């Protein structure tokens, strides 16, 4: 075999391996994921080498992009908060539909604040408090809180330790 065809075959094998690794890690096709990733990164300057290194190290796309959509909002994320899951949107819907008469709602371990914030956007007559033990998580939650007209009160607390009333 000629050297160029061996090189071409090796590149093709590497491409297949990358696509399989992508699908296994991110649970979508390489083309879909890469398109989405590049769309998100297009909004800011980025180093392709750094992004490829992060992908190789199985860093979630949400952390690479530093933001993610959840329910009706876009949330800033980093490795100090968990990534919002689509399944959690079912919980938000359930709370909005079944607990609209509640005057106070408490979100323990709020992380990015996405659950509490999305609920606060719909239940305008409710006072919503989110707690977290991590100062860094609360910094993210407070930044994300700017998108709500019914801001959530975020408190540094180990579960109920700093909660006066519930």
Give names to the regions the model predicted.
Residues 165-166:
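Short loop/helix-cap segments at secondary-structure boundaries that form the rim of catalytic
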Residues 24, 28, 79-82, 146:
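Short N-terminal micro-motifs specific to bacterial/archaeal maturation
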Residues 2-65:
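N-terminal auxiliary segments of SAM/dcSAM-dependent transferases
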């Amino acid at each position: 075999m000629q050297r160029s065809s061996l090189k071409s075959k090796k590149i093709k094998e590497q491409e297949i391996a990358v696509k399989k690794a992508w699908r296994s890690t991110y649970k979508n096709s390489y083309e879909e994921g890469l398109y989405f990733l590049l769309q998100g990164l297009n909004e800011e300057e980025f180093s392709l080498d750094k992004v490829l290194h992060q992908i190789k190290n199985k860093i979630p796309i949400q952390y690479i992009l530093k933001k993610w959509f959840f329910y009706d909002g876009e949330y800033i994320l980093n490795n100090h908060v968990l990534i919002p899951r689509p399944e959690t949107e079912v919980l938000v819907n359930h709370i909005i539909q079944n607990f609209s008469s509640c005057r106070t709602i408490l979100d323990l371990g709020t992380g990015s604040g996405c659950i509490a914030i999305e609920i606060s956007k719909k239940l305008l007559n409710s006072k919503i408090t989110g707690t977290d033990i991590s100062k860094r998580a609360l910094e993210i939650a407070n930044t994300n809180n700017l998108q709500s007209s019914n801001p959530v009160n975020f408190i540094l607390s180990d579960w109920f330790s700093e909660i006066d009333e519930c």
